[in-house]
Amino acid sequence: EWFSKYRNLLELGTQTETGIRLKPTFVGAVQSALEESSPQNLPFRREIHNIPVPQGVKAQLRPYQQKGFSWMVHLHKQGFGGCLADDMGLGKTLQTLTLLQYIYKPSAPKQPATLIVVPTSLLHNWRREAKRFTALSMAEYNNTMAIDKEQPEKFFGHFHLIFTTYGMMRNNIDILSSYRFEYVVLDESKNIKNSESLTFRSAIQLQSKHRLALTGTPIENSLKDLWAQFHFIQPDLLGTESAFQKQFIMPIRQGNERVRVQLQQLTAPFILRRSKKEVAPELPELTEETIYCDMTKEQNTCYEQEKNSLRNILLQHPQSTNRLHSFSVLNGILRLRQLSCHPQLILPDYTGTSGKTAQIIETFDTLQSEG
């Protein structure tokens, strides 16, 4: 009976003369083993006390958002990373911003900046909500920045929040990895689910004291996705990908229930997922959001050529009231609108991509993965 009860701990830990030595990240396995025999000695309390919303947050959190914020503070104090996996629409952005306002409270010592990596379509929304709900300073890291790789703190050190996109992270990882951030936050963290992708390899190069992943997709649904997310959040929890494949993926696929439960116990303390039906049934099923899209480089070149052509028509006949001239102008405006959607609407030989189309596909994939 004793062996059966503590078998998982024996497999995960190292036996010493006085007991079993385990990594702090194996807290979930310890929690499960002690739950019945020594509930008073649990390393993680099941009921986390609510932390007061910090000064500077200009929003009233719903009860479940208060719990989510308090859960993140609890992990922060223990030195752990986490994955907030609430359904879309439950306010993962606000909960995260509340955590960051808590960390950067005026009475706290000066901390390094936090890097928030987001899909391009969500960049505007994050900046807008950060300005609206917090008193934190912020900047966007983009292609216009000239940052000294040897002294990145000269730029990053002036702000609390640094926003950037996954594309910028991939293309400028040499700069971003030269600075040790307080937090690295990945929104729509499904972007790193492919461990062979450049996005994943770039994300795990980032340096920080703490890491947080935000997703509306249940990461437990795919074991390889689960490993990739946790290799970013808490690299020492699930080991290397090959070891994880051997220790967990293969046995679980063969129907080994004990191993499946063991994996669930290991990861449970670091994942918080609530459904809309569970915590906020009063929220409307349909929400409307305006998403701003940037044109791709090739698309923008076509757009600028058409715009210059239209400008020349206007400059050549500035006072013309000729109906044919007016038609040419209206047709030019229509062509600009079509180019902003996708150049192939008027240029059959165009082989590039479109910012809007890419965003529609990305948003559809997100909605589909979230049910």
Model-assigned labels for residue ranges:
Residues 1-43, 110-111, 226:
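Charged, low-complexity intrinsically disordered regions
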